[in-house]
């Protein structure tokens, strides 16, 4: 019971920090919409599209009424993020998202999937001069979900792969204070919290070839506890 209370307090503290970062979000959304409409009037369709994608992303960041979202909703955010990054990297970034239909209504903590995609983009594609790919795959595996984020970027040495996997498996609130890959650690902590530590992390890859992160979690359904929400094939 004490451990559960500590986890709830930690989660509430994280949500409070998110609330502190909301500097009049409605003003921001209205401003973005004004810029988008102005761009459309000037027939600057590409700029309008970029602003629209940015608004989608920003709305997810500031709306913390519920930490859980469906896989379908999280994938909308992933698509918006990758589409925006495509404007930045051009032909250097290609991506493919493959989600099995029976996974769409399962729930994941908000912004977890996109955190791993962002990591693949920044640490994989950004440091590579030649074109690369990011693959996002989600499918059913036994009694849960298997989430796979693969990039054909710069990759990592074996020691770094092992270090990253260990950090993900041992992710804790305390680790968030130490800097480093804070986004990844934050995502791992929340995945551990909502699944009651019933999550598996695996990191594979090769330097100069790419990296694959695999996450296995129960298939959580809205309004149910972890034990009740596991859905078999």
Where do the language-model regions lie?
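C-terminal end segment of the histidine kinase catalytic
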Residues: 201-233
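Two-component histidine phosphotransfer core
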Residues: 1-202, 212
